[in-house]
Amino acid sequence: MLHVRGLGLPGCLALAALASLVHSQHVFLAPQQALSLLQRVRRANSGFLEELRKGNLERECVEEQCSYEEAFEALESPQDTDVFWAKYTVCDSVRKPRETFMDCLEGRCAMDLGLNYHGNVSVTHTGIECQLWRSRYPHRPDINSTTHPGADLKENFCRNPDSSTSGPWCYTTDPTVRREECSIPVCGQEGRTTVKMTPRSRGSKENLSPPLGECLLERGRLYQGNLAVTTLGSPCLAWDSLPTKTLSKYQNFDPEVKLVQNFCRNPDRDEEGAWCFVAQQPGFEYCSLNYCDEAVGEENHDGDESIAGRTTDAEFHTFFDERTFGLGEADCGLRPLFEKKSLTDKTEKELLDSYIDGRIVEGWDAEKGIAPWQVMLFRKSPQELLCGASLISDRWVLTAAHCILYPPWDKNFTENDLLVRIGKHSRTRYERNVEKISMLEKIYIHPRYNWRENLDRDIALLKLKKPVPFSDYIHPVCLPDKQTVTSLLQAGYKGRVTGWGNLRETWTTNINEIQPSVLQVVNLPIVERPVCKASTRIRITDNMFCAGFKVNDTKRGDACEGDSGGPFVMKSPYNHRWYQMGIVSWGEGCDRNGKYGFYTHVFRLKRWMQKVIDQHR
């Protein structure tokens, strides 16, 4: 296989490709946009041509035919000569005209299998944007810069590192399509490409709100229509039927919402919208209606006005039924080794100060007991750390759905495949008399979890077989109410992420270089929603928020592989409790400039959690 190293990319084409993509929110590009990336840009002079001028190589090898020895005399390096000679021999058949020959040498077009191609096309022949070669989302590549160091696997540009007979290709950003070929111009054959461009027809993925007159406000709370079938096609049970009365006995329904026949309604102000009871487990399902976009939190207010100047009720109110939820909610978020002893951890003040001045802190080794709600989701066979998670009561654990079910990574775990380890500090060592190991009774994944597109509603509940006893190192975190979300989930305010994930993004085979020995902590600022949306071409929904450092920030930090499913928490300055605002969900690489970590918006899915938990009476 011929590997090409050290050749510059054509700058104009790079700018054209990136400019055409950066404003798009589509996974699938429009045909005109996709085809525009295939236009070749001519340059009067180039970095490669400058290299050729060294030692009259241009005259010897471009204007005339040269030998390997003549090229070596000019370049004076076996490695540089091998790189040049590999391209030179491939491109020898298109020496005329000179412009075509230079296109081939500089990798702006493909010859034969396209091993010479080093251009900036980053979309497949069907219009799917390419995945970054260094990223593991949505697909885990088996070809990367470590396995193929000479293949020039930069950004998400199409390449042919494995000598595919179809020519240059890439991993795609579509979770259902692992890899696909790209349409690359063929050298010396105007209008011909390595494979034909056949863009797919896909629906719009714009983040547009429906017109006000065509959508339901308040997530359908006042909906009075006659829809009586759920999104999954299940018939709704009548609200006055015996099974429904039993299921809703302890529900606190809004009296303004009229529960008529078996029509879909939203009597508990569920952020997911209207729903109804059904005959099968978990006993309820959601209905398909068109809701207006009404984001909760993440508004960018002045810190002094929103925190220091606001009178807020600091009294804590429980939300769940203790009979089904278990113990711990009344005392949640108060750490035994800190708040209960009137102590603070070493960066807590800076975290709280961010609500006013927005200072930034790097990651560090966690103090013991700093996150007593942290859970390790552990695979039984082979034994390995799978994900993070969080303890929300003595019976229930919260994690990301993709930790349980994600077909692109061959994940589809059952209760028998997993266990949870609670109270841990060390990543690998068994901590006798401190950690507790618990088996799972039941896994609940959100019925609208969307792994095929964007990991929307990336949330799962784990029911423990036995209640776990609390200790100095085992204690539940609080789940936020609307007031807490409105007060704290604002751009510039900082939350805390904990986990045993990789310390940095790398393809090294030496695991000890990148995996921490103990629990890690990092404080991250919440990012404005428009900035989040502009940072990616993956569709962002109201069930997500993003956090992380911007390009001009002096400090760094991010969640990384292995942190998934873990908590994003914030401390309330009113009642001094810790609330889980988010679940570590996904990101395009770790701590990359212009990229942020995305988190599941816990509050928006809290009513779903309540209804699932209430079935366990």
Curated annotation (Swiss-Prot):
Q: Indicate the segments forming the Kringle domain, all copies.
A: 109-187, 215-292
Site (Cleavage) at 200-201, 310-311, 359-360
Question: What the entry says about post-translational processing?
Answer: The gamma-carboxyglutamyl residues, which bind calcium ions, result from the carboxylation of glutamyl residues by a microsomal enzyme, the vitamin K-dependent carboxylase. The modified residues are necessary for the calcium-dependent interaction with a negatively charged phospholipid surface, which is essential for the conversion of prothrombin to thrombin. In the penultimate step of the coagulation cascade, prothrombin is converted to thrombin by the prothrombinase complex composed of factor Xa (F10), cofactor Va (F5), and phospholipids. This activation requires factor Xa-catalyzed sequential cleavage at 2 sites, Arg-310 and Arg-359, along 2 possible pathways. In the first pathway, the first cleavage occurs at Arg-310, leading to the formation of the inactive intermediate prethrombin-2. This pathway preferentially occurs on platelets and in the absence of cofactor Va.
What are the GO MF terms of this UniProt record?
calcium ion binding; endopeptidase activity; heparin binding; lipopolysaccharide binding; peptidase activity; receptor ligand activity; serine-type endopeptidase activity; signaling receptor binding
Disulfide cross-links: 61-66, 91-104, 109-187, 130-170, 158-182, 215-292, 236-276, 264-287, 332-478, 387-403, 532-546, 560-590
* Signal peptide bounds: 1-24
Q: What is its EC number?
A: 3.4.21.5
- Give the region (High affinity receptor-binding region which is also known as the TP508 peptide) as residue ranges: 547-569
Family recorded in the similarity comment:
Belongs to the peptidase S1 family.
Q: How does it assemble?
A: Heterodimer (named alpha-thrombin) of a light and a heavy chain; disulfide-linked. Forms a heterodimer with SERPINA5. In plasma, interacts (via N-terminus) with alpha-1-microglobulin; this interaction does not prevent the activation of prothrombin to thrombin.
This chain's protein is named Prothrombin
Tell me the classification of the organism that encodes this protein. Answer: Eukaryota, Metazoa, Chordata, Craniata, Vertebrata
